[in-house]
UniProtKB/Swiss-Prot annotation:
[4Fe-4S] cluster 2 binds at C85, C89, C92. SUPFAM superfamilies: Radical SAM enzymes. Residues 1-26 are annotated as: Disordered. Belongs to the radical SAM superfamily. Lipoyl synthase family. Pathway: Protein modification; protein lipoylation via endogenous pathway; protein N(6)-(lipoyl)lysine from octanoyl-[acyl-carrier-protein]: step 2/2. This is Lipoyl synthase. It catalyses: [[Fe-S] cluster scaffold protein carrying a second [4Fe-4S](2+) cluster] + N(6)-octanoyl-L-lysyl-[protein] + 2 oxidized [2Fe-2S]-[ferredoxin] + 2 S-adenosyl-L-methionine + 4 H(+) = [[Fe-S] cluster scaffold protein] + N(6)-[(R)-dihydrolipoyl]-L-lysyl-[protein] + 4 Fe(3+) + 2 hydrogen sulfide + 2 5'-deoxyadenosine + 2 L-methionine + 2 reduced [2Fe-2S]-[ferredoxin]. It comes from Bartonella quintana (strain Toulouse). Its cofactor is [4Fe-4S] cluster. [4Fe-4S] cluster 1 binds at C59, C64, C70, S298. Pfam families: Radical_SAM (PF04055). GO terms for molecular function: 4 iron, 4 sulfur cluster binding; lipoate synthase activity; metal ion binding.
Length: 320
């Protein structure tokens, strides 16, 4: 059977690689997942700044439930290197396909927006760019340098892909000295083949460990979603794996199914279970844990950075 698509009148399929998958039912969200629709004046101003600079945000592309709250506080996470990803993770709402050429003017536009919004802390992330020799590492570095020039008081957090098969890429990003280096594991290793087939769990662990080896002053961070069918003991083992890589900060949030073609939600974790993970994480030695149903990597990132700084200072004081 051949499907003919009218390229003039039809929108590009956002997830062509998922079209062969059977539809799955989307469960009704429990009350603790509900969020208010964005309505504030500041939300509109943030939206206008993003559009004026022709930028992409992961807040919109990934369908983040916290976009109303964050944008109303002038918090935005910029997604560089385009809006088309070369991978097809079963949980992700970012479009998959063949990316466009890298926009060489993007670093300056991002820096201009950061300065205009007077951000204290900014998160820079990207799609996977397996098509690029360095996976986009040099572009990450250019964005960091541009922000340092135009908004020197802003602290910078990067949320990077895994740079798999990209020798030297990680070193380029670390040399640009972001304040926080985040790379998400996303899920437990037993779910990788189905949920994150283009990645490798222990490669991601090693990536985070290598950041600390290259520059111990950079905070490291990683996060997962729960509700994909993982077992509790797998989550606890993952925490241990992150601590063995000297990761400072972990986030845990509830997976929410974007469309019927995406991986279904197997279970909604209640708030008290997230609280339990947060307590366990602190005992295991993380400087900070953010664990609740609506936690996302960039949610409250600025506040979390301040907590990280304080926790590290207190840890060093005890060691003297």
């Amino acid at each position: 059977m051949v499907t003919v698509v009218d390229r003039v009148t039809s929108r590009r399929l956002r997830h062509p690689e998922k079209m062969h998958r059977p539809d799955t039912s989307i469960q009704k969200k429990p009350d603790w997942i509900r969020v208010k629709a964005p309505t504030s004046k500041i939300y509109k101003e943030t939206y206008d700044i993003v559009r004026a600079h022709k930028l992409v945000t992961v807040c919109e592309e990934a369908g983040c439930p916290n976009v109303g709250e964050c944008w109303s506080q002038r918090h935005a996470s910029f997604m560089i290197l385009g809006e088309i990803c070369t991978r097809a993770c079963a949980f992700c709402n970012v479009a998959t396909g063949i990316p466009l050429a890298v926009d060489d003017n993007e670093p300056e536009r991002v820096a201009d927006a950061v300065a205009q919004m007077e951000l204290k802390h900014v998160v820079i992330t990207s799609v996977d760019r397996d098509d690029l020799a360095d996976g986009g590492a040099q572009h990450f570095a250019k964005v960091i340098y541009a922000i340092r020039r135009k908004a020197p008081k802003t602290t910078i957090e990067v949320l990077t892909p895994d740079f798999r098969h990209k020798d030297g890429a990680l070193e380029i990003v670390v040399a640009a000295k972001p304040d926080v280096f985040n790379h998400n594991l996303e899920t437990v290793p037993s779910k990788y083949l189905k949920v994150r087939p283009g990645a490798r769990y222990f490669h991601s662990i090693r990536l985070l460990q290598r950041v600390k080896e290259l520059d111990p002053t950079i905070f490291t961070k990683s996060g997962i979603m729960v509700g994909l069918g993982e077992e509790r003991n797998e989550i606890l083992q993952l925490m241990d794996d992150l601590r063995s890589a000297d990761v400072d900060f972990m986030t845990i949030g509830q997976y929410l199914q974007p469309t019927r073609k995406h991986h279904p939600v197997i279970r909604f974790f209640p708030p008290e279970e997230f609280e339990s993970f947060a307590k366990i994480g602190k005992v295991k030695g993380f400087l900070h844990m953010a664990s609740n149903p609506l936690t996302r990597s960039s949610h409250h990132a600025g506040d979390d950075f301040a907590i990280l700084q304080k926790a590290r200072d207190e840890k060093f004081a005890l060691q003297r």
